[in-house]
Structures are given as structure tokens and as C-alpha cells.
């Protein structure tokens, strides 16, 4: 299969074949990251702009490392260091970046749809690194890679996503992607954190953590996104953790070889207890490692290096 897509905007857009191609390509880059000299000349002469209008640690650093390991020139721009603070529109900023002739623009923005707007404005490839509560495709891809490597495949597995589903772009991207790969997805959380129409995406809904993780092969815990909430949707963090914190007792309801995942940042003692986050079931740090390989694969494919 030849890669033909210009942008990575969401898991909803990707075909099963494209997902397989990304994950297979990422596997080859895992070996690069394990070397003493973690650099290959694949993207020498290419320029990657990481334009993060919304705060990020893992994703921005991961994209920067991915570009540098492929020998690309990487430039990081934050909202506070851009002309957005002077009143320039996002569209004008994008056109100015386009005029500098980079090869890929990676964007994170608090507004859903911002990457899609840029993709229609500029000729460069756009990677959505998270847009509001909409999508976060590279996170879903690294999650799928982690599951596939640990379980030997994806089809037929039971994956439960627990937490603030309503405000989570990670949940939405994983639902789109996992459904396409034949995974049975269950979402769980308080009723105030579950969108009313979520079942239309092909998921099962539970309001009990214990019920949701019965027979689960993978449990994906999400933090409460207080920065996106317009009002209090639960009485207190203590009450939330009483019912929805994954701990050594309730995890016994899941399969013995269950994987525990978290996109980070982790709020220990709220959605997940420390002994589970650091325990034998946890693959949280493996997700981070795989994230670099997945983002290397995306940059490699979008710049045409594969051809």
C-alpha cells in the first residue's frame, strides 16, 4: 500500500489499512529508539513545526524527539511566544508559517476543528496533536500499538474506558480507532461525564466501574478534565475516587492478565491508585515509549520518505 493522505486529523478519517500501515511502520522505529545512537538520517533537510497553542508536556516532547531522531529540523512554538497574543488570527499565523515552507505542522489547540481549518488553508501536512474535546489521533494510535504488542492483536478484545468521557479527545479517538479494528469498547463513568449520544459510536455504556471492567482485556483510565468543565459535575474528588478509582480490590473483577493504561497526566488516588499505576498490570510508561515510535511513523509517512 502507498501512503497518499496529506494530513492526520482524526481516527474517524483513517481506514483500517492506513492504521495497519502506521502501526507497522512504528514497529520498525521502536528499534531505532532502543539503540545507543538514536538517530537516522531519514528526514534530513525536512522541517517540522510543533505549534502548541494549548499546554502539553508528553505530546510536544514526543513529537520533538520523533522529529530529531529522524534528523529533521524541529521548531517549537507556544501560544505565549507567538503573535496570537498580539491579536493575530490563527489563520494569519498559519499562512505566515506556510510562507516559511516547513514540511509538517503539528498543532494542538483548545478549539475543536482548528487543525481541520489549517489543513484547508496551507499546503503543508497537518497533524492534529489534540483539538479541544474532539480528537487526539496520535494518542489513540500509540494506545493501539501498545495493546497490539501486548495482546498479539486487537480484534475481539474487550477494552473499557473509564472517566471523563464527555471532555476526552483521547476517548473519542480510541473509540473510532478501536471499533474499526474489531474491538468491543465499553465506556464508564458518572452519568454527568457520559455524553447522551455516545452509544451511537458503537460502545456499551456502564455507570458502575465494577460492572464495566468485568472480562476486560484492557482498562483505560482517564483523568477528570477540570480545565474543560463549565460547572461542577460531581460533588468532590473524594466522592469520585470512591466510585471510580481503579485499585487493587476492584481490578480483581477484570481478567488476570488485564492491561492498565492511562494517557497522562495521572492524578494518583483520584482515577487510579498508586499501586495500580506502578503495578504489574500497568503499561503506562510503555505507552510513552511507543508514542515516540508512532509519531516518527507519522512524520515519515507524511513527508513522503516512505516512497
UniProtKB/Swiss-Prot annotation:
Belongs to the aspartate/ornithine carbamoyltransferase superfamily. ATCase family. The keyword Nucleotide-binding does not apply. Its EC number is 2.1.3.2. L-aspartate binds at residues 86, 169, 223. The keyword Transferase applies. GO terms for molecular function: amino acid binding; aspartate carbamoyltransferase activity. Keywords: Pyrimidine biosynthesis, Transferase. HAMAP family: Asp_carb_tr. Catalyzes the condensation of carbamoyl phosphate and aspartate to form carbamoyl aspartate and inorganic phosphate, the committed step in the de novo pyrimidine nucleotide biosynthesis pathway. GO terms for cellular component: cytosol. GO terms for biological process: 'de novo' pyrimidine nucleobase biosynthetic process; 'de novo' UMP biosynthetic process; amino acid metabolic process. Heterododecamer (2C3:3R2) of six catalytic PyrB chains organized as two trimers (C3), and six regulatory PyrI chains organized as three dimers (R2). Pathway: Pyrimidine metabolism; UMP biosynthesis via de novo pathway; (S)-dihydroorotate from bicarbonate: step 2/3. This is Aspartate carbamoyltransferase catalytic subunit. It holds the Pfam family OTCace_N. It catalyses: carbamoyl phosphate + L-aspartate = N-carbamoyl-L-aspartate + phosphate + H(+). The lineage of its organism: Bacteria, Pseudomonadati, Thermodesulfobacteriota, Syntrophia, Syntrophales. Carbamoyl phosphate binds at residues 58-59, 108, 136, 139, 264-265.
Amino acid at each position: 500500500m502507498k501512503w497518499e493522505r496529506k494530513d492526520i486529523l482524526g481516527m474517524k478519517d483513517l481506514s483500517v489499512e492506513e492504521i495497519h500501515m502506521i502501526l507497522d511502520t512504528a514497529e520498525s522505529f521502536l528499534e531505532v529508539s532502543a539503540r545507543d545512537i538514536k538517530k537516522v538520517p531519514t528526514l534530513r533537510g525536512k522541517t517540522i513545526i510543533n505549534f502548541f497553542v494549548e499546554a502539553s508536556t508528553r505530546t510536544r516532547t514526543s513529537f520533538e524527539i520523533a522529529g530529531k531522531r529522524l534528523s529533521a529540523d524541529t521548531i517549537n512554538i507556544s501560544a505565549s511566544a507567538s503573535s496570537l497574543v498580539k491579536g493575530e488570527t490563527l489563520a494569519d499565523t498559519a499562512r505566515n508559517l506556510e510562507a516559511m515552507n516547513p514540511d509538517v505542522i503539528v498543532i494542538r489547540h483548545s478549539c475543536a476543528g482548528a487543525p481541520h481549518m489549517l489543513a484547508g488553508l496551507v499546503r503543508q501536512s497537518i497533524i492534529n496533536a489534540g483539538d479541544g474535546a474532539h480528537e487526539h489521533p496520535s494518542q489513540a494510535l500509540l494506545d493501539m500499538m501498545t495493546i497490539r504488542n501486548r495482546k498479539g492483536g486487537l480484534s475481539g478484545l474487550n477494552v473499557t474506558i473509564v472517566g471523563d468521557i464527555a471532555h476526552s479527545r483521547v476517548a473519542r479517538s480510541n473509540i473510532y480507532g478501536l471499533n474499526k479494528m474489531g474491538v468491543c469498547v465499553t465506556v464508564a463513568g458518572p452519568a454527568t461525564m457520559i455524553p447522551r449520544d455516545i452509544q451511537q459510536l458503537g460502545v456499551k455504556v456502564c455507570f458502575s466501574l465494577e460492572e464495566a471492567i468485568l472480562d476486560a482485556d484492557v482498562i483505560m483510565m482517564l483523568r477528570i478534565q477540570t480545565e474543560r468543565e463549565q460547572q461542577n459535575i460531581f460533588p468532590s474528588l473524594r466522592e469520585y475516587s470512591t466510585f471510580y478509582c481503579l485499585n487493587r480490590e476492584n481490578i480483581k473483577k477484570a481478567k488476570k492478565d488485564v492491561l492498565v493504561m492511562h494517557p497522562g497526566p495521572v492524578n494518583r488516588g483520584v482515577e487510579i491508585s498508586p499501586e495500580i499505576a506502578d503495578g504489574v498490570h500497568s503499561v503506562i510508561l510503555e505507552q510513552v515509549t511507543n508514542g515516540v515510535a508512532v509519531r516518527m511513523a507519522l512524520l515519515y509517512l507524511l513527508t513522503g520518505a516512505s516512497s
